[in-house]
Amino acid sequence: MKLRPLHDRVVVRRVKEEEKTKGGIIIPDNAKEKPQEGIIVAVGNGAIGDDNERVPLDVKKGDRVLFGKWSGTEVKIDGEDLLIMKESDIMGILDK
């Protein structure tokens, strides 16, 4: 199944968090925080502005982004955990 978000929504896959600290201590699953960083896997076609014109999104598929701790709605598609959020929930794009 493929998910195509509508309007100004994006689908994000969280990046995997480190299993160990820099000092080599293994972090148990219940002590890990969910990463606030992810990769855009799909984008909507933009919101409709006040002038009834479509406003394109600033992010694109493949962008690595930062978002708020409580941003988005968690969904499971084909066994993969994803987030659906509005573009305004994204704080920034990480440049490579």
Swiss-Prot record:
Chief location category: cytoplasm
CDD domains documented for this protein: cpn10
GO cellular component: cytoplasm
Signal peptide span: none
Biological processes annotated in GO: chaperone cofactor-dependent protein refolding
Keywords noted in UniProt: Chaperone, Cytoplasm
Disulphide linkage map: none
SMART domains in the record: Cpn10
Location relative to the cell: Cytoplasm
GO molecular function terms listed in the Swiss-Prot or TrEMBL record: ATP binding; metal ion binding; protein folding chaperone; protein-folding chaperone binding; unfolded protein binding
Pfam families: Cpn10
Superkingdom, natural source: Bacteria
HAMAP family in the record: CH10
Recorded family membership: Belongs to the GroES chaperonin family.
NCBIfam families (alphabetical): PRK00364.1-2 (NF001527), PRK00364.1-5 (NF001529), PRK00364.2-2 (NF001531), PRK00364.2-4 (NF001533), PRK00364.2-5 (NF001534)
Summary of the function given for this chain in its UniProt record: Together with the chaperonin GroEL, plays an essential role in assisting protein folding. The GroEL-GroES system forms a nano-cage that allows encapsulation of the non-native substrate proteins and provides a physical environment optimized to promote and accelerate protein folding. GroES binds to the apical surface of the GroEL ring, thereby capping the opening of the GroEL channel.
Quaternary organization: Heptamer of 7 subunits arranged in a ring. Interacts with the chaperonin GroEL.
UniProt name for this protein: Co-chaperonin GroES
Gene designation per UniProt: groES
